[in-house]
């Protein structure tokens, strides 16, 4: 079956070589006569998968030895609760509000009893079209929470602030797509379904000194319990971890995160350059804050936007509709998305624009 160009914001496109390997190994993994989905999580076969996945992500992100790598469940949304529960410890928590997902993290933190949340910077005044300047954080604050890529709004934070307190980052939509210095963070978390693998897995990278600060937490929500049990306090998402391991291997073959970032910059530049020179399409995001992985764009008409999405689908360009909260279109160009797909999209955009510059909507 011919594959389409999938611009989904998540679950998102996976590398074809990874999917092909999954297909080959689906019925019998490593000659076992069992699918990975059927392996006991306590088996040697799965333990090797888990160990390899951790070793690879440590290599790709250059994770220091004093950080734990956890493969958890519950999505990044569960980390909106686990982070303040484990790290606030009676202190104030500082948050930067750069979009819809940051707002959800802030809202969840406020629900945790005993946690005082302070929003120290926000870009909501201009519809989250930029990254705000982050003031110096007081040393009596427990942590500073940032979102490095705002999936819905299409902005990204590439320069992480130096801070006297631990920086916590939601990297769900740009982990492994740009190089970040892990040592600048106290904790990084990311849902897997954009750049890592299938939905159902959450990656958490946490500095060891931040673990175990709060006693009496529910076991499943306690980083200490999860770390002491090497991500296997309960049955982990075994198949998702297996696919993630294959994706990590694929990223390594592409030249690691630096190699992937170079390709991502090329893909994003092609699309942004076209949008900027177009008199039909435009970007709502300030150039200095533009994401490499999520590119929103609009026409000057909601009717044209609707027609574009419909015709795009008919031509093999799937999931270009913008998030329901902002409208327009959004092209998600995650690591596995091919540059040929960007070139094909631009050609389609030009054809669509030329056909409608007279002002008529043709659906």
From Swiss-Prot:
The modification N6-(pyridoxal phosphate)lysine is found at residue 194. Binds 1 pyridoxal phosphate per subunit. Its cofactor is pyridoxal 5'-phosphate. It is found in: Cytoplasm. One of its GO terms (cellular component) is cytoplasm. The keyword Amino-acid biosynthesis applies. InterPro entries: Aminotrans_V_dom, Aminotrans_V_PyrdxlP_BS, Pser_aminoTfrase, PyrdxlP-dep_Trfase, PyrdxlP-dep_Trfase_major, PyrdxlP-dep_Trfase_small. Signal peptide: none annotated. Keywords: Amino-acid biosynthesis, Aminotransferase, Cytoplasm, Pyridoxal phosphate, Pyridoxine biosynthesis, Serine biosynthesis, Transferase. Pyridoxal 5'-phosphate binds at residues 76-77, 101, 151, 170, 193, 234-235. It comes from the Bacteria. GO terms for molecular function: O-phospho-L-serine:2-oxoglutarate aminotransferase activity; pyridoxal phosphate binding. Pathway: Amino-acid biosynthesis; L-serine biosynthesis; L-serine from 3-phospho-D-glycerate: step 2/3. Pfam families: Aminotran_5. PANTHER family: PHOSPHOSERINE AMINOTRANSFERASE (PTHR43247:SF1). Belongs to the class-V pyridoxal-phosphate-dependent aminotransferase family. SerC subfamily. Homodimer. This is Phosphoserine aminotransferase. It comes from Listeria monocytogenes serovar 1/2a (strain ATCC BAA-679 / EGD-e). The gene is serC.
